[in-house]
């Protein structure tokens, strides 16, 4: 039993051990599983973060249009970092040491400030003395523009006595530099010397002034100049230096003034045309300054308020500014001249001001002055001042101006002209001063072994290079007139100086045939351009001459035909003097001028007399012609005191447009009579004849069309003038005959009995109105505003196309010159309505005056 119990105990112990082992194994598996899960999570998180970083890095790299894998992104990142490290190393090597400049300034800003502080400018000179680069700070120091110095010789700006010294310095180093390497040129070639340089002036006629300067610089090899340079230095070298130059060495120096300037003449304007506004009192004190002013003039508003503007102006500009301000106070607005304004940095800046006066809105008194100041560059100021002085600008500026004057399609390429001629001037010679001597004095090229050629003794103005072809072209354009110019001769004369210069220039031994052919080709191209321009000018001359010839022919036609009109601007109308109408054979001149007032009367057709005559016009200009009588078979007969047969020539319809006065006076030497005024407005010249006739029943008949006969009353006056109304039906011009023809066969229209009855009535009315003769001027004045009856005698016409003029108002005018057209054979009073009775009485009063003024011996018997 004991064995059995022990066995059972041992089995129970074994079971417990197995279960504990199994449990331990399960626990270990659970722990491992948890670790693996945790490890997988952390690994996934790391991979996700890595992918995000790779993606972000790939998006920052250039050229990420396509999706890149991780290795490509990492490779490009490595390349970028390596390149950035190299650039940083180069920048550190070329960077100015931090103990020199503040950290907030760039290299260019610090260089500009250093030049201004040192009163200096950069200058690059070739070993022969030609200037290839100059910085803009030369303007504030020597008043030269950079364009004045570039491509010039340094000897043009140095006194003649210092030429040999400067030339010796440059040429000596030229001989030494032949055996030096570019590395030696960088370390062992510093040079320093002093000389005088010419100051620039606005007026070249002013006496020359020289400034003592110091050159400090090194010789640089142009072969080692980097391709990326600042301030256009590379462009200047490429334009100026040709492959023919063998040395390729230039002297780059900092030029400083020996005597510092406490106040600069002017500062360099980086952005011209900047503006700012200020407000001044009538005493020219600052009242307001806008926010744009401090960056330009340096002053804050509170620093200038209450101060006078004259405190900041240059002393040389005060007189001109005072005149401008006087003009402002006189006219209320204006524009100032160019003047210098002192900035806070003690520099002069050029300004121009537009100003006007504002007035109080209640009392209209001047309140203050509003000014708009514009910054201008010194180049613009100098160009304007030289234009006022009549001095031509330097060659680049004048060439640009002249190219703008010519047409855009036919403009001469002045840049190519300049460069083509510069190829000859820049031809290399063994002499280092030959080029400067040619530019300064146009003398012969010096011998290679001789001393440098000196500039002319007259150094009052800096010599400028003059291109012969440009001079000829300027002279040709200035002296150009209306006469024609031979294009071939002009073209040859223009190009001959340049060709002769090219022929006289010594050709160096090293110049190739290709360069010579290129120069000749440039000259041929220049010649073709000049000839083309000349042909264009000649064509313009011929065209203008043809137009002038046509105008002269028209003037001769007008003067030859004789009628002249004088326009008087003081009168509202047109004053026609001594008008003469033309007809058949004899000539009868008018004596009194025609005055037409009032309105413009267009005349489509005017036909009068036997033939359909009208006032002849030539190209809408009234032409003076003499009045001529025609044959008796084409006459219109009218009974008058002293009548003559007249007629007007039959001409084609014309249009007459002229402003007419209220009175048109046509003189006639005869006594007063009844005047018929025939006129027509035919639509067709072939219409049948129309005659206005009177029948025995005293009724007026019109054969064709709607016609209205103006009632005209005549009274003989010494001057014998005919008054024409200003308002006429259909705008027709009324022309009355000065003389009238009588024929026996046309006098039968009115009987003798009617004449006797009329004479009796006239005598009775004269007796009744004798007490009223004292009031005659008043009655005549009132009669001008009333229509007067008239009787028109029938006219027998030999030419068919006739119609009578239609008018609607009475002729009126000055009583002393008025000829009231009265009826020589008036109808009975019953012919007219009762309203005309008083008018007829006034007619009889004028008739009485006519009888007293008319010479009975000149009146033909009825």
From Swiss-Prot:
Protein name: Circadian locomoter output cycles protein kaput
Modified residues (Phosphothreonine): 451, 461
Site (described: Important for interaction with BMAL1): 84
Positions of region (Interaction with NR3C1): 371-861
Pfam families: HLH, PAS, PAS_11
GO biological process: cellular response to ionizing radiation; circadian regulation of gene expression; circadian rhythm; DNA damage checkpoint signaling; entrainment of circadian clock; female pregnancy; negative regulation of DNA-templated transcription; negative regulation of nuclear receptor-mediated glucocorticoid signaling pathway
Keywords: Activator, Biological rhythms, Cytoplasm, DNA damage, DNA-binding, Isopeptide bond, Nucleus, Phosphoprotein, Repeat, Transcription, Transcription regulation, Transferase, Ubl conjugation
Start-end of Low complexity biased regions: 478-493, 623-637
Organism name: Rattus norvegicus (Rat)
Domain (PAS): residue spans on this chain: 107-177, 262-332
PTM comment text: Ubiquitinated, leading to its proteasomal degradation.
GO CC terms: chromatoid body; chromosome; CLOCK-BMAL transcription complex; cytoplasm; cytosol; nucleus; perichromatin fibrils; transcription regulator complex
Locus of motif Nuclear localization signal: 32-47
Polar residues biased stretches: 405-416, 447-461, 638-652, 853-862
Cross-link position per record: Glycyl lysine isopeptide (Lys-Gly) (interchain with G-Cter in SUMO1): 67, 858
GO function terms (MF aspect): chromatin DNA binding; DNA binding; DNA-binding transcription activator activity, RNA polymerase II-specific; DNA-binding transcription factor activity; DNA-binding transcription factor activity, RNA polymerase II-specific; E-box binding; histone acetyltransferase activity; protein dimerization activity
Lineage of source species: Eukaryota, Metazoa, Chordata, Craniata, Vertebrata
């Amino acid at each position: 039993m004991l064995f059995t119990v022990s066995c059972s105990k041992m089995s129970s112990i074994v079971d417990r051990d197995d279960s504990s082992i199994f449990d331990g194994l399960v626990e270990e598996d659970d722990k491992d599983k948890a670790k693996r899960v945790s490890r997988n999570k952390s690994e996934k998180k790391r991979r996700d973060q890595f992918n995000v970083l790779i993606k972000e890095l790939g998006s920052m790299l250039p050229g990420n249009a396509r999706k890149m894998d991780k290795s490509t992104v990492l490779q490009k990142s490595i390349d970028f970092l390596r390149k950035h490290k190299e650039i940083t190393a180069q920048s550190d090597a070329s960077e100015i040491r931090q103990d020199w400049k503040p950290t907030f300034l760039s290299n260019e800003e610090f260089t500009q400030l250093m030049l201004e502080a040192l009163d200096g400018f950069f200058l690059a000179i070739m070993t022969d003395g030609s200037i290839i680069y100059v910085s803009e700070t030369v303007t504030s120091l020597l008043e030269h523009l950079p364009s004045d110095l570039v491509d010039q010789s340094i000897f043009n700006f140095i006194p003649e006595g210092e030429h040999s010294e400067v030339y010796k310095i440059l040429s000596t180093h030229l001989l030494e530099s032949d055996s030096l390497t570019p590395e030696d040129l960088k370390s062992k070639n510093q040079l320093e010397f002093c000389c005088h340089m010419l100051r620039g002036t606005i007026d070249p006629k002013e006496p020359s002034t020289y400034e003592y300067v110091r050159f400090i610089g090194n010789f640089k090899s142009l072969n080692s100049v980097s391709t990326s340079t600042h301030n256009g230095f590379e462009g200047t070298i490429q334009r100026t230096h040709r492959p023919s130059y063998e040395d390729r060495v230039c002297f780059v120096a900092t030029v400083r003034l020996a005597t510092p300037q406490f106040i600069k003449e002017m500062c360099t304007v980086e952005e011209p045309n900047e503006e700012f506004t200020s407000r001044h009192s009538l005493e020219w004190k600052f009242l307001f300054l806008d926010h744009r002013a401090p960056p330009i003039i340096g002053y804050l508003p509170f620093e200038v308020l209450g101060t006078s503007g004259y405190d900041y102006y240059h002393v040389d500009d005060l007189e001109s500014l005072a005149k401008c301000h006087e003009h402002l106070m006189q006219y209320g607005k204006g524009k100032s001249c160019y003047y210098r304004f002192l900035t806070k940095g003690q520099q002069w800046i050029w300004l121009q001001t537009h100003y006007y006066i504002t007035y109080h809105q209640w009392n209209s008194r001047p309140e203050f002055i509003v000014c708009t100041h514009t910054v201008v560059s010194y180049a613009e100021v100098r160009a304007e001042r030289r234009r006022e002085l009549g001095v031509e600008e330097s060659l680049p500026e004048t060439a640009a101006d002249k190219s703008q004057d010519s047409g855009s399609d036919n403009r001469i390429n002045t840049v190519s002209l300049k460069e083509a001629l510069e190829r000859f001037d820049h031809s290399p010679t063994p002499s280092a001063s030959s080029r400067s001597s040619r530019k300064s004095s146009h003398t012969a090229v010096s011998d290679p072994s001789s001393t440098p050629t000196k500039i002319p003794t007259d150094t009052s103005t800096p010599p400028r290079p003059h291109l012969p072809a440009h001079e000829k072209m300027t002279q040709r354009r200035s002296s150009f007139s209306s006469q024609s110019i031979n294009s071939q001769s002009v073209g040859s004369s223009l190009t001959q100086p340049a060709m002769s210069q090219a022929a006289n220039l010594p050709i160096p031994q090293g110049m190739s045939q290709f360069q010579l052919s290129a120069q000749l080709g440039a000259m041929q191209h220049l010649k073709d351009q000049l000839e083309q321009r000349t042909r264009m000018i000649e064509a313009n001359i011929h065209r203008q001459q043809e137009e002038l010839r046509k105008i002269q022919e028209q003037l001769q036609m007008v003067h030859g035909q004789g009628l002249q009109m004088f326009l008087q601007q003081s009168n509202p109308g047109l004053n026609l003097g001594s008008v003469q109408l033309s007809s058949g054979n004899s000539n009868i001149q008018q004596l009194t001028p025609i005055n037409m007032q009032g309105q413009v009367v267009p005349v489509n057709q005017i036909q009068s007399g036997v033939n359909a005559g009208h006032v002849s016009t030539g190209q809408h200009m009234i032409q003076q012609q003499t009045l001529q009588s025609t044959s008796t078979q084409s006459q219109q007969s009218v009974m008058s005191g002293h009548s003559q047969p007249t007629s007007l020539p039959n001409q084609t319809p014309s249009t007459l447009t002229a402003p007419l006065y209220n009175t048109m006076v046509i003189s006639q030497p005869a006594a007063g009579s009844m005047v018929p005024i025939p006129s027509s407005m035919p639509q067709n010249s072939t219409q049948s004849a129309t005659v206005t006739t009177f029948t025995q029943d005293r009724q007026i008949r019109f054969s064709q069309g709607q016609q209205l006969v103006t009632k005209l009353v005549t009274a003989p006056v010494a001057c014998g003038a005919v008054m024409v109304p200003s308002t006429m039906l259909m705008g027709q011009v009324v022309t009355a005959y000065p003389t009238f023809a009588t024929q026996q066969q046309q006098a039968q229209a009115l009987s003798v009995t009617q004449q006797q009855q009329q004479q009796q009535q006239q005598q009775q009315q004269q007796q009744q109105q004798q007490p009223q003769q004292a009031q005659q001027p008043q009655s005549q004045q009132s009669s001008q505003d009333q229509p007067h009856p008239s009787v028109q005698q029938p006219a027998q016409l030999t030419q068919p196309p006739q119609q009578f003029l239609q008018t609607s108002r009475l002729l009126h005018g000055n009583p002393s010159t008025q000829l009231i057209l009265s009826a020589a054979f008036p109808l009975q009073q019953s012919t007219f309505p009762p309203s005309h009775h008083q008018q007829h009485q006034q007619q009889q009063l004028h008739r009485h005056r006519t009888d007293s003024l008319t010479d009975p011996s000149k009146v033909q018997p009825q």
